Structure formats: structure tokens, C-alpha cells
UniProtKB/Swiss-Prot annotation:
Residues 27-45, 267-279 have a biased composition (Acidic residues). Residues 215-228 have a biased composition (Pro residues). The keyword Coiled coil applies. The modification Phosphoserine is found at residue 306. It comes from Mus musculus. InterPro entries: CCDC40. This is Coiled-coil domain-containing protein 40. The keyword Phosphoprotein applies. Residues 308-369, 425-451, 581-649, 733-768, 830-871, 919-972, 1044-1118 form a coiled coil. Required for assembly of dynein regulatory complex (DRC) and inner dynein arm (IDA) complexes, which are responsible for ciliary beat regulation, thereby playing a central role in motility in cilia and flagella. Probably acts together with CCDC39 to form a molecular ruler that determines the 96 nanometer (nm) repeat length and arrangements of components in cilia and flagella. Not required for outer dynein arm complexes assembly. Required for axonemal recruitment of CCDC39. Keywords: Cell projection, Ciliopathy, Cilium, Coiled coil, Cytoplasm, Phosphoprotein, Primary ciliary dyskinesia. Specifically expressed in the embryonic node and midline. Pfam families: BRE1.
Amino acid sequence: MMDAEKVSTDGEAISEGEVGSNGETPPETEVEFIGETAPDTDVEFIGETSPGTDVEPTGESIQETEVESIGEATPGMDVEPIKKTMTELNVESIGEETSETDVDSIRKALRGIDLESITVAYPPKKAKHRKVRPQAEVESTGRAAPEGELEVSDHEKVEALLDELDELSEIVSSPEVSYSDISPLEMGEDDTNVSATSTDTFQQGIYEPIEPIEPTEPPEPAEPPKPAETPEDSTVRAPAHPYQRDFPMGARHRFRLSIMGSLTPSDTDDLPLETDEPPQQESVQSTPRALEETRIQFLDQVQSLSPEALLDRATEGSDEAEEEGSQLIVLDPDHPLMIRFQEALKGYLNRQMDKLKLDVQELDVATKQTRSQRQELGVNLYGVQQHLARLQMQLEKSHDRHSLVACERRRKEEELQCARSVYNKTCQTANEERKKLAALQTEVESLALHLFYMQNIEQDVRDDIQVMKQVVRKTETEKMHAEVEKKKQDLFVDQLTERSHQLEENIALFEAQYLSQAEDTRVLKKAVTEAITEIDTIAVEKKRILQQWTTSLVGMKHRNEAYKTVMDALRECQHQVKSTDSEIEVCKKSIMQEEEKNEKLARLLNRAETEATLVQKMTAQCLSKQEALQTEFNTYQLALQDTEEMLNKGYVEHSAVLSELQATRQAFHQEQELRQKMDMSMVDKLQEQGTSSKMTKYFHQLLRKLQKENTNLVTHLSKIDGDIAQATLDITNTNCKIDMHKKTLAEMDKEVKRFNDLITNSESEIARRTILIERKQSLINFFNKQLEQMVSELGGEEAGPLELEIKRLSKLTEEYNTGVAEAQMTWLRLQQELVQVTHEREEQLVSVDQLKKEVHIMEQKKLRIESKIAHEKKEQKIVSRHMRDLDNDLSKLNMLLDKNRCSSEELEQNNIATETEFLRTLKDSERETIQMQEKLMELSEEKATLLNSFMEAEHQIMLWEKKIQLAKEMRSSVDSETGQTEIRAMKAEIHRMKVRHGQLLKQQEKMIRDMELAVARRETIVVQAEGQSKIDKKVITKTEFHYQQRELQKKVREMHKATDDCTNTISELEETQKFLSSSLQEKQQLLSEMQATTDVLEEEINQLTALKRQNLLEIVTLQTRGKHLQAAIEGKYVFLHRNSRSQLMERKRLSVRLSQLNKVLSSVQEDYPQYQEVLQSIQQKIATKLETPEPS
């Protein structure tokens, strides 16, 4: 019978022609068997396993006594046959579901099932009839009575055994055992004790169909939870979850226990249904008044759970739910805020327990009166056994068919899931390819636009080059024409002497022109000074500076051309005057030299001023860049130090958490071994002292303490696992940050090496060119000496060949001047391009900053979405598990209802007593469906609370992320005003949080008061319901019974619809999860592409800045070189230091400055050793410069 009792906790699906849960059994199968066996058959008691079933975890087997067939097993009444006939399939289904669990968890669960089956089958049933079979009909099965038989004449032995059975029923029927909110796993050991005592009692050969004596015991414990459940209820049920994971049927066992604990009246009320014979009907009609009172009390309890009462409780809980804003927080039972509520609930439960004890005493008196009637029930046992065997065979066949259909359905669902996954993957790849194509198209369009711009710029440059070439050709033709004319004038010198007087007049005219030109020069000087002041005032406006610069350069070009034409005319006049008067030529030469010196000085002044402004701008830019790089370096160094500290902290925390985890695991294993030992010892002691109620209560308390400690250890272990996961996540994040910093450091090292190479190359080039300049300067000095010597030999007059040499040299100087002019034009163009490049660089820097911010935001969103996805997966697993449980329960209910309809035709022939029994079973099934609905609502509320707590935690995480981001922005920001505004915003946020905290404290106090009022309200509702039930004592007719049956069928259909809706929502959540994963991958690809573009842009910016610096240095060197060469050619080069003393002073000043730079570099190396290799080469060059001996 153990298999039947174990399966009764879950197995409620029965086969064709089987008995339903509503108690509608055929007349021949309504006698409960407790201890009697049919002739020539062996009996299975509690603790033994039938060979026909597959239950192996109990570890017990029948040695020499076996059942000849499954159909000859011991039957009971309507619930007991269900338990026996459903043994094989339900145990097989349990074996399928628990294939991944270990034997220990299955053994614990089966112990809980044994307790439930005993509490349902045996303790509540007191004697209606009592009959002892003859000695020939009883056989001993492993643990038989001493003689193996019991005769009718041994009346004293029967009375002693009945007294022991009464004491056992009082133990099992106590509220501590039959309370519906205690899971089977929490009562496993008690179950074994009770089963042991019951087997010892039943082996004596007693037949005890029992009258229900506890219809009033389970009202409060079995009362369905209210829609707005208090936190106390939720916390009481919380520890059952870990067991549900170890054993998938755990949730169902717990639910079944609460249901079957409250269905005890229905199991025994079906007993009179077998009384088709007149003698049995008379015994049913002679039921005492106690039975009628228990039936009325049971109906009152069922009516207290009517839909109207549930709606009233739902409206009361909805008000509290609206105030909390659908954010229920489950408090710990040891929390100080729960003390007041627990005291109120304790007082209420104590009153209920006192009331129940009084009811039990009254019912014990009633059972003693009805004990003499229970012997009559064993007469029809053999026929019932034969009928039960046939029904069991039919049930096994139907279970086999059901398992085959279920396997086929599961296989089809797996194929459908594979097809869906393949389709989703193909859609995702197609979307990715489309997005890549769109990105490539946009990139091609941008490149085409860039190419068009570059072609336009190239065309403009070519046009400028062509214009410059035309100007050069024109000047060359003019020079050739002037040379031809000069040769003609040399041939006609004699004719020019005659025209000397005319030339004197021309000289006077030229002197007047000279005066006018001097005034023009003064005007030009004023204009130059005004231009300088305008350049200083318009330094901020870069565009206007470039425009005025180009116009001033064009004006200078025109003035230089006019000056060259005037100089050519003057030279011609001087040659004419030389032939007439040498003194006039000497004066003219001195005048011309002074004029040239004046003009050159003016040009040198202008160029020097422009160069000074350029140098100042470049130095300011270099200083700003240096400061920016210094700040960036400091920020990177601080970030690196922070990451290293965080990594060390993470390693320390990880090691600490691992040690704690190891210690808790060892403690858990020790506690588990200790618990097993205590279980075995308690089983042995309880088998020896089965009738001692005090010992059983003591062991109940010990078991509850051990179970509480076990649940606490499991919760602590789960918390430690979560901490370890969080620590590993932090470690991975810090490792990623360290890798990123290492990469940036390597890139910066590469850039420093590249800049060092450029500096060394430029220095070598400067040294080479200085050597060439010195050589050319020596050649120029040598030629000047030769020229002076030749002029002195000729007496101060120049001959024809010398004039030709001078012309050649003047041509060379003009060519150099044209080259300088071209270099100036190219320099202007480069300056314009530089301005454009700087604008583009600033725009790109702004875009890069924006992209970095977006990347950071996307990373945060990614982390949040991953956490949401993981949470949704967990919820889906939980919901799918509960949905499977509910589907199984609904399928079993449907089968029971089908059996109910089949048996209703036969029940119409029964009398008024059978109708009342059917009414009880109907109420039991209605209460079972209501409890299932309340269980579903309870699960939804738990899910809502978990979601709310998760949202709160996510909100806190977002707040901390926001604070961290604000701190980083405050550190990196330069503008103090923006930091002050953010600080004020943070203070306002802190103030709002404090106000919210005060509001939450008030709301918490209000909720505690509401909880206390809810306990009082519950008591008043129960009292009112009991009074109303006593007033409204009605006998339900047959039509009302059929109406209630139809209502139940309607509720079952609604439950089916609800399950369909749940499956639809699960599929929708899966689709949203797939969509989110695809979008996340797309955003990651977009982020990688944006990162690649930013890297390319940064490389281009670096190249452009290097090219800009190189061009600026080359332009400056070329300009200074051209100036010095022009002055050397014209013999107007002026040394910076006219004497050796000033030169030595300047050299000392430069050496002091170099020594200061050397000290600065050494201090920088000490402060920042990571840049020691970069600065070492510069310091060595400065040292070599300092070590070179000074020239004497």
C-alpha cells in the first residue's frame, strides 16, 4: 500500500471507468481497506514496495511475499483505489521528472508523500464499521501479528488495538501535522514515524473504515490565501523553493498536502456509497448526530471560501497594493517591523487552535459512538478487490497509451523549436548583411564627395602655378630687353656726352621724383605700422587675418615690381652720368647705396615683425598643446592607479569569499550528515515508542528546528554564490580596463618614438644645412674681396666685363628673389590650408568626444540589457516549471471530472444519503480548484515582488552609475561653473531621496497597522461565516448539485484559457528576447565601426599636425636663409654681435638656458620614469652642446 499512498499525493489522473476525486465511485468499490487481505493473496503494507511498480528509492522490497497480480492489491475506498491504481504511471512520471536528481532527494520527497497519504487515508477516518475477518483469510506479510490471525471472540485484544489507533489518530490529526502550509519535505520524518505506527497497527488484521472526525481542523490552515497576501504568509512559504529545485515534484507535493489535508472528510464520506444492499443503507441512515454536525461544519468552511468572500478580500488587498504602487517587499520573519504583526497573528492562531482542540474532543466522543459500526464494512471487501484489480489493469493500459502520445508530442515540439531557431538565425544574418550594405553605400558616397573636393582644390592650385609661370616669363623678357638696350647705350657713349646738359635737367627731375618717393616711403611706413596694429587687434579673428595677409602680400609684390622698374631707370641714368662727371657718379652711387639700405631695412623690419608674430602664435599653440597633453597624461595615470587598486581589492575579496564558501559548504555537509543520523535515530526510536504522543511532539519540534537551519544554510550558500559571481564580474571589468590602458600606453610610446625620430632627422638636416651656409658664406666673402681688389686696381671705375659680371650676379639675385616670392606664395597657401585643417581638427575632436560618450552610454545599456535578459530567462524557467505543474494538475482534474460524469448516471439511483456524500466531494473538488487558483495568484504576486525588487536594484545601480559619471565629468571638466551646477543638482537629488525615505517610513508604519487590522478582520470574517453557515443550513438538491458541477467545468475551461494565455505570453517574451539580442549585436557592430573610424581620424589628425609642424619649420628656415643670403649678396649683412664681448655674453646666456632646460628634463624624468627613454636623447644632445668648448 505504500506505493498507492505515495502516488496519492500527485497522482490524481485516473483511467477509464476509474473512480473520480469527487467521490463518485461505483457501489461495489466504496469500502476502505486498512488491514484485511483477500484469500491466497499477499498484502503490501507501508514501508514495502510492490513488484509491479517502479519505486526504488525507498530501498525496501518484499522478500518472500509478493502480490500475485496488481489487481489483487489491497484496495481502499474512492480515494484509496485511486492511489493504488495510479501507482505505476505516476511513479514513472516522477522518475522521468527526477532523472537528474539524486536518490537522497527522492527518498526525502517520498517520505513526505508517505506522511500525506497516511494523514489523508488513515488518521481522520474513525470507525463506522468494524469487522474482523476469519483466521483463514489473513496471512502475515513480513511483519504480521504474533499469531498472524485475529478472531472475532478476542474482544479485549480488539479494544486495546482500537485504543492505540485512537491515540495515533489524535497525533496525526493535530493541526501541527495537517496544517496545509507545511510542505511535505518539512514533515518527512514525522511521516515515517506515523507510517511505522500505522503499519504495526494494521498488521493485526483489523478493518477500520473510519468516520471523519476532523472536518473543522483544516479550515484555517487550508484556507486559500488572500489576493493581497500579507508579508508573513509569503515569508512562511519561502523556504520551500530550494527543495523544489532538487526534486521537481516538490511544489506539487506541497500543494497536494494542503489539498489532501483539507479533503480528509471527502475520503471517508464516500464510504457509505457501497451500501447498495438494504442492510448497509440502514446503517447509513442510522448515522448519529455527530456525523451531521461535522458535515454542516465542513459545508460552512467551503462556503467561507466562496467567490464573494474572495472578491471582498481581493478588494481589501487591492487598496493596499495601489498605495504601494505595485511594489511589494517581502520582509524577513526576524525583521523588527514584523514583531507586532506576528504577535497579533500568534494570538489569532492560538485562539483558533484552542477552538480546534475543543472540536476534536467533541468529535472523539462522536467517534467512540460510531466505532461499533465499522466492522460491517469488511464483508464486501473481496468483491471490491476483484473489481479494483480490473480497474487497475485498465488504468495501466491507458497510462501506457498516454506516455506514448506524450513522447511523440515532445519530439514534435523539439523539431518545431529547431526549425524556429534556424529561421531566426537566417533572418538575423539577412538583416546584418543589409545593414552592412547600407554602411558601405554611405562610405562610398562620402569618399566620392571627398574626391570631388580634392579635384577642385587641385585645379585651383594648377591655375595659380600657371599664373606664376606667366609672370616669370614676362619678367625674363623684360630683363633681356633691358640688356640689349644697355649694350646699345655703351656703343653710343659719345653721343650721350653731347646730351649731358639734357641729362642734368633730367637729374633735377629725378631728384624731385626721389623726394616724392621718400614721401611715399614715409606713407608706406605709416601704413605698415597701421597694419601691424590691425594684425594685433584682429588676432582673434582668424579669417580676417588671412584675408588681410593675402592682400598685404599682393600689395608688397606690386610695390617691389614698381621699385625694380625705378631702380632700372636710375641705373640707366647713372651710366649716362658716369661718362660726363665722375664726381656726380660717386654721389649717385652713395645715394643709391643709402636708398637700397633704407629699402632693405624697411623690408627686413616688416619681415622680422611678421616672423615675430608667427613665432609667438606657434609658441602659444605649443604651450597649450603641452598643457593639454600633461592633463591627459595625469588623468590616465590616476585612472591606471585606480584600476590597479580596484583589481587588488577584487582579488582580496574573491579569496575571502572563496574561503567563506568553502567553510559554509563544509558546515552544510556536516549539518546534512548530522541530520541524516538524527533522522535514522528518530526513526528507530519512534518505531519503538509509536504510541507516545509526547515523544512525537518533541521530535516534531526538533525536525522543524533542523529544517529551519537547513533552509538558512541554503539561503546563505546562494548569497555567497551571488557574491562570488559579482566579484568575478568586477574582476573581468577591471581586467578589460587594464588592457585598454595598456593599449593606449603602447600607442603613446609609439608616437613618442616617432616624434623622437622626426626630431633627430630634423636636427641632422639643420646641421647639414648650417655647414652648407657657412661654406657659401666663405665663398661670398672671397668673391667680395676679389671684387674690391679689382675696383681698387681700376681706380674706382668699373670696366665693361665687370659690369657684365655685376649684371650676371644681379640676375642671380633676382632669381633668388623670385624664388623667395614663390616660397612666400606657397607659404600663404600652406597657411590657408593650415587654417582649414585646424577648423576640421576642432570639429573632429568634438565629434570624437561625442562618439566616446555614446560608446559609454551603449556599454551601460548593454550591461543593463544583459542583466534583464538573464532575469527574464530565470523567470521563464520558473514560469515554465509552474505551468507544467499546473498543466498536470488540470489534466488530472479533467480526467477526474470525466469520471465524475460517467459515474453520475449510476449515482442517480442512490438515496438522499449518497447525494449528501456527493455534495461533500463536490465541495472538496471546488476547494481544490480554488486553492489552485490562489496558488497561481500567489505565484504571480511573488513574481511581481521579485520584479519590483529587481527594478529597485536596477534603479539603485543606475543612480550609482550616474553619480560615478558625474564625478568623472567633474574631474575632467575645466569649467568650474558647470561643476557647480552639477553639484547643486546632486544636492537636490539627495534632498528628494531624503523626503522619499521619510514617506516610505510613514507608508511602512501604515502597512504594519494594516497587517494587524487584517488579522483582526480575518477573525471577524471567520466568525461571521461560521454564524452565517449555522443560520443557512440548507440541503442541496440534485439540480443544485448539477449546477455546481457545470460551474466547476466552466472554471476548468477558464483555467485552460489562462494556461493558453500564459503560453502565448511566454512565446512573445521569447520573440522580444530574440529581437533584443539581434539589436544588441547590431549596435555592437556599429560601435566597432565607429571605433575604427575614430582611430583612422586620429591617425590622420596626427599626420596632419606633424606635417604642419614640419612645413612651418621649413618655411621659417627658408625665409631666414633667403634673407641672410640676400643681405650677403648685396654686401649689407650685419652681424648680430659686432664685437667678441657681446658674442660671449650671448653664448653664456644660451649656455645658462640650456643648463636650466637640462635640470627641468632631469626633474621630469624623476617624476615620470615611464618617459625616461624619450627624454634621454634630448638630454644627451643638450649635454653635448654644453660640453663643446667656447671659441676664443
